[in-house]
Amino acid sequence: MDDNNSDWTSYDFGNDTIPSPNEISLSHIGTRHWITLVCYGIVFLLGVPGNALVVWVTGFRMPNSVNAQWFLNLAIADLLCCLSLPILMVPLAQDQHWPFGALACKLFSGIFYMMMYCSVLLLVVISLDRFLLVTKPVWCQNNRQPRQARILCFIIWILGLLGSSPYFAHMEIQHHSETKTVCTGSYSSLGHAWAITIIRSFLFFLLPFLIICISHWKVYHMTSSGRRQRDKSSRTLRVILALVLGFFLCWTPLHIVDLLILVSDQPSERFEVNLNLAHVLTLCLAYINSCLNPLLYVCLGRGFKENLISSLRSVLHFASEAPTHGPSMTTNSKSTTDGVFREKPV
């Protein structure tokens, strides 16, 4: 159960309620709590411009291609996820008090996890696509088209919506006092909470992680098998390690903490405070993955940095010239972005 602002550890089980870490004042956390807010702010400041830049380059400064569709949708999902941070930081700075009402509680929680799930699924699709480019090059040349990529991206958004449906359905506000309202998840039984946690961890973490690892390992193995390719194998290995470690390190702690929350039935007050802090910090790590994606999946791609610089120069050139020079700038810019994403694996 993931939520940085709402208490996903407080489930309504009829007459039995798991103690809520949010019922313990965050003033006990002190400096660490504000450090967490600073971390969230840094993620916002890095993730928003980074992903917005990728959206701009892939959506407006390069030709339509399969890779462009992958990275455009990935950047949109990560951008929307990062844009939600300021709203979700408000309760964190107010002792978990949710001031936005019941509808916003459901919408912000559900949409946030929808974006995260779409991001994970897109990483899987990118890995499988690179695997097919290496193992089935002829098939990809005949069947790999931007139209199919757009359809698959649409399906991914639908799957992300379905995966986040428990958050839309079970998030609600609870009044802890006259001045404090908490956005929390309410379930009918502990078994129900366990089922959702296990299914989510398998479908949106364990299975994607295995697919990403196997796909990239196969890509590395095949691209380094020939003598002419060995010079590039070390760079390929570095990129693959960055991709796999980035995904693993950003997502594993969150799922471990989620399981600890369910296992710890009646923890001590000190343990509850530490567990709540750990949950917030591991959510920050998951957010960091949204910052790393543009760097790992785009900036390490062939030709992206050169074409990004070229596009920025074109914009500056356009801004400094008269409007009559606009068409020539557009034509030149178009020609410089043809190689942003080559239809080959890294």
UniProtKB/Swiss-Prot annotation:
Membrane topology: Multi-pass membrane protein
Highest taxon in the source lineage: Eukaryota
Keywords attached to this entry: Cell membrane, Chemotaxis, Disulfide bond, G-protein coupled receptor, Glycoprotein, Membrane, Receptor, Transducer, Transmembrane, Transmembrane helix
SUPFAM superfamilies xref list: Family A G protein-coupled receptor-like
Membrane-crossing segments per the record: 34-60, 66-89, 107-128, 150-170, 195-220, 239-261, 280-300
Pfam families with a match to the protein in the record: 7tm_1
Chief subcellular location: membrane
Composition bias type Polar residues, residue spans: 327-338
Locations listed in the record: Cell membrane
Glycosylation sites: N4, N15
GO biological process, any: positive regulation of cytosolic calcium ion concentration
Family matches, as InterPro entries: Formyl_rcpt-rel, GPCR_Rhodpsn, GPCR_Rhodpsn_7TM
Presence of the UniProt keyword Phosphoprotein in the record: no
One term under GO cellular component: apical part of cell
Stretches in topological domain Extracellular: 1-33, 90-106, 171-194, 262-279
GO molecular function terms noted in the UniProt entry: complement component C5a receptor activity; G protein-coupled receptor activity
S-S bridge residues: C105-C183
Residue intervals annotated with topology Cytoplasmic: 61-65, 129-149, 221-238, 301-346
Family assignment from sequence similarity: Belongs to the G-protein coupled receptor 1 family.
Stated role: Receptor for the chemotactic and inflammatory peptide anaphylatoxin C5a. This receptor stimulates chemotaxis, granule enzyme release and superoxide anion production.
Protein name: C5a anaphylatoxin chemotactic receptor 1
Protein's organism: Danio rerio
